[in-house]
């Protein structure tokens, strides 16, 4: 009986309820696919309030992991009181689709950013309108690329959360060392196939990972099946598209106001990388470290995360008014 219990639909329900209560509604739009041939398209699923913006627009970009609704569920309520919040599923995640693997290369951060720019232009009342943007983890890579490519006239201010823009192969080796013995690759943990790998991912990503009695193997297998196994081929394809750490992803200062947010116990991207990212932006970015949180401070201490983010965004908006 226990093995038939699935928490995934329950978590989906509560996350969707937070979005609906914040006034956001699910929708989708078909757009030209940036890396496809003539006539290639992608379908982008997103959440946003209906109609044209009555408040300043804010784009929230999820990371490489569970659904966007899970990752931003604690933010949409407080943020929607001040901003027209737009939460897309990136290419290959959630309800967003792109051409088959055989027809197109895996989308890079640049491709993801170009798709988001096209989405913004396609939304009611958004063409050419300046939008604030925030991204977490992999979503921070995409947000940085979008801000740099679009420029400050289109995108800004910018929030980069738990996102090592300077990640290298040495960082991957450090990650495996922190994980302990028995792991041969980062992907083995980031795309878990067994309960032990899922438990290790939770341990590394969280300041207070759930105790083992609360994460029995049957429950973790269900999460693995629904979040990873059913989508494994696509997720592996997406990982191959990541260009951070290569000469295709060069970090240079951008003209927008930037807030960097990091958990002090992040074991995926350790805190020292936050200071390195800040230096790479000529030290002009503001850095906020949220204590007693790991890789997802927006979920582990949403009250603090939301205050830091709102203070920054509202001050930036006021200075532009």
Model-derived segments and their meaning:
Residues 48-98:
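Conserved HGGG/HGGXW glycine-rich cap/lid loop of the alpha/beta-hydrolase fold
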Residues 256, 270-279:
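Short alpha-helix in the alpha/beta-hydrolase fold that links the catalytic acid
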Residues 283-321:
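Catalytic active-site module of serine/aspartate enzymes centered on a nucleophile-bearing elbow/loop
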